[in-house]
């Protein structure tokens, strides 16, 4: 009689694997927990080659961690997803997911089946989103530009630029409004990637500036070229204008030494003809990602055109999109002939080389197809400038979301406290097993105001109790429903009306983080078996099919 089927690996099942997963998730959440909120602390991460990153952006911290545990990887990917989808709320989504898992694990230990917990969580998430949309949203039309500035300031409050929040919030709002365009369906769009952020260390934060136009960190190819061109016609080339050399391996047999000179002459004429074709269309600004030989620069100087070499491909794409140009990787058409047409050119009102701060930059102003904006950041050192860039990215995304969806919710733990009270009452109305799961979901949400208070060195138990009392009153007593805007004031350590204080977050940040955290918790909760296969051993003679063939083990 044969023995049972053996699995070549380590297998853990049931409660052991669930506890393991919950512990892994909790340890990831504990890493980012202290960086949460307006008084959160920063993390210093050093990679294997010694590069240092100082940040308190949840997505960046988790991206730089090398995590082995599969359940912990789910949370790292969750933060990355929140960053890509919304741009802000990356730390809170991880903290909520870990807390949901911890409380679900407690229920499972009390012999409640994971399926009941999962269906309870799904129901609670659905109800929470409905409650936010019906009761907690504030329409931005009634608040105007102030609402955008306050949302940006709320996003920046936990970051390195929070101290100059007013200055940067106005800059961010102006930048997002500058890149606005209307798509084919008539919807306004705000492509945040069109805001070019350049960093130059030196000076203070407050000397950072917003520039109307797209800034390139390049200079003109030759001193003899004009530094300013009005009514620019821009050619975007993704190849170098250097002397054409024959490919490696090409052999030419020559009988007459004069032919060698002709070959060399032809090599230089090919590039000369390309340049003449480009200039013949009226192009007066040529941007290329490659190099331009000095001997060819004279043709541009003679034509009075501005040629810029070594432009970053990312920048070239943005310039092409903004000016309406086509990026060409070759001049050859389908027939193999080299042509360049006027339709391939982009247009801008002005291209100028200016000295801004301590650097020479090329500014492309008032492009034809779309408007663009650039922000130049100043800071004490590279670490600071990098962190400022991450902070601005979050703020830009927040302003974009507020403009697109035209609604915000109060910050400072107000939404979580309101949902916690509502879901607790909702749970008692449920007559099924889901009641316990919904109650745990409600309790899990309090981790947000709790963590905010702990990080601000306040008495979290006292503050959260007061906050819950206000929200309970708002939901029980219709006359006092304005208390639903009450959130935490972490500087003075007391509850306050966050609608009046101007602490706003985009609705989508809260809704998405709830949905993503619930889905991530459910994904990990469903796992009840973990099989880790052993790596194939090197000294196993018959480990692979090839080895078996060579050793003759397969011969009859």
From Swiss-Prot:
Organism of origin: Mus musculus (Mouse)
InterPro entries: Chap_CCT_alpha, Chaperone_TCP-1, Chaperonin_TCP-1_CS, Cpn60/GroEL/TCP-1, GroEL-like_apical_dom_sf, GROEL-like_equatorial_sf, TCP-1-like_intermed_sf, TCP-1_chaperonin
Subunit structure: Component of the chaperonin-containing T-complex (TRiC), a hexadecamer composed of two identical back-to-back stacked rings enclosing a protein folding chamber. Each ring is made up of eight different subunits: TCP1/CCT1, CCT2, CCT3, CCT4, CCT5, CCT6A/CCT6, CCT7, CCT8. Interacts with PACRG. Interacts with GBA1. Interacts with DLEC1.
Keywords assigned by UniProt, alphabetized: Acetylation, ATP-binding, Chaperone, Cytoplasm, Cytoskeleton, Hydrolase, Magnesium, Metal-binding, Nucleotide-binding, Phosphoprotein
Binding site for ATP: 37, 89-91
Entry's family note: Belongs to the TCP-1 chaperonin family.
Modified-residue entries (Phosphotyrosine), positions: 181
UniProt-recorded name of the protein: T-complex protein 1 subunit alpha
Gene designation per UniProt: Tcp1
Residue positions where N-acetylmethionine is found in the record: 1
PROSITE patterns reported for this sequence: TCP1_1 (PS00750), TCP1_2 (PS00751), TCP1_3 (PS00995)
Entry's Gene Ontology molecular function annotations: ATP binding; ATP hydrolysis activity; ATP-dependent protein folding chaperone; ubiquitin protein ligase binding; unfolded protein binding
């Amino acid at each position: 009689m044969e023995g049972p089927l053996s699995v070549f690996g380590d297998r853990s099942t049931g409660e052991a694997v669930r506890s393991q997963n919950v512990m892994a998730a909790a340890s990831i959440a504990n890493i980012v927990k202290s960086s949460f909120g307006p008084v959160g602390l920063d993390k210093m991460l050093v990679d294997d080659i010694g590069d240092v990153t100082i940040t308190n952006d949840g997505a960046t911290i988790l991206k730089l961690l090398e995590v082995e545990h599969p359940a912990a990887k789910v949370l790292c990917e969750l933060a990355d997803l929140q960053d890509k989808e919304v741009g802000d709320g990356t730390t809170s989504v991880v903290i909520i997911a870990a807390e949901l898992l911890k409380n679900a694990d407690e229920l499972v230990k009390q012999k409640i089946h994971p399926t009941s917990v999962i269906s309870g969580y799904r129901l609670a998430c659905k109800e929470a989103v409905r409650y936010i949309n019906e009761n907690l949203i504030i329409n931005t039309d009634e608040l105007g530009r102030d609402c955008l500035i306050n949302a940006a300031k709320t996003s920046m409050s936990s970051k390195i630029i929070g101290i100059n929040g007013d200055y940067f919030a106005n800059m961010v709002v102006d930048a997002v409004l500058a890149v606005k365009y209307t798509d084919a369906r008539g919807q306004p769009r705000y492509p945040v990637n069109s805001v070019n952020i350049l960093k130059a260390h030196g000076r203070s934060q407050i000397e950072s500036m917003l520039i109307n136009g797209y800034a390139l960190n390049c200079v003109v190819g030759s001193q003899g070229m004009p530094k300013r061109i009005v009514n620019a016609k821009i050619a975007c080339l993704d190849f170098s204008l250097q002397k054409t050399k024959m490919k490696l391996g090409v052999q030419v047999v020559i009988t007459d030494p004069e032919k060698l000179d002709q070959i060399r002459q032809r090599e230089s004429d090919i590039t000369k003809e390309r340049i003449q074709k480009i200039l013949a269309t009226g192009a007066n600004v040529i941007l290329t990602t490659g190099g331009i030989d000095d001997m060819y620069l004279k043709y541009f100087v003679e034509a009075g055109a501005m040629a810029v070499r070594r432009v970053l491909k990312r920048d070239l794409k943005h310039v092409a999109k903004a000016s309406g140009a086509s990026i060409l990787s070759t001049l050859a058409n389908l027939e193999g002939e080299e042509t360049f047409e006027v339709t391939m050119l982009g247009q801008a009102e002005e291209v100028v080389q200016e000295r801004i701060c301590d650097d020479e930059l090329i500014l492309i102003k008032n492009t034809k197809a779309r408007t663009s904006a650039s922000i130049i950041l100043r800071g004490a050192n590279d670490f600071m400038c990098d962190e400022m860039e991450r902070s601005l990215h979050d703020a830009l995304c927040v302003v974009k979301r507020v403009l697109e969806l035209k609604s915000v919710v109060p910050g400072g733990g107000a939404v979580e406290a309101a949902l916690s009270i509502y879901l607790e009452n909702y749970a008692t109305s449920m007559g099924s097993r889901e009641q316990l799961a919904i109650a745990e979901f409600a309790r899990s949400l309090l981790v947000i105001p709790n963590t905010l208070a702990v990080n601000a060195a306040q008495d979290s138990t006292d503050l959260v109790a007061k906050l819950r009392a206000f929200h309970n009153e708002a939901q029980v007593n219709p006359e006092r429903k304005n208390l639903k805007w009450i959130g935490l004031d972490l500087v003075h350590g007391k509850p306050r009306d966050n609608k009046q204080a101007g602490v706003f977050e985009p609705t989508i940040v809260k809704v998405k983080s709830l949905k993503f955290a619930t889905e991530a918790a459910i994904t990990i909760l469903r796992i009840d078996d973990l099989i880790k296969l052993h790596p194939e051993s090197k000294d196993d003679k018959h480990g692979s099919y090839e080895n078996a063939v060579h050793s003759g083990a397969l011969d009859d």
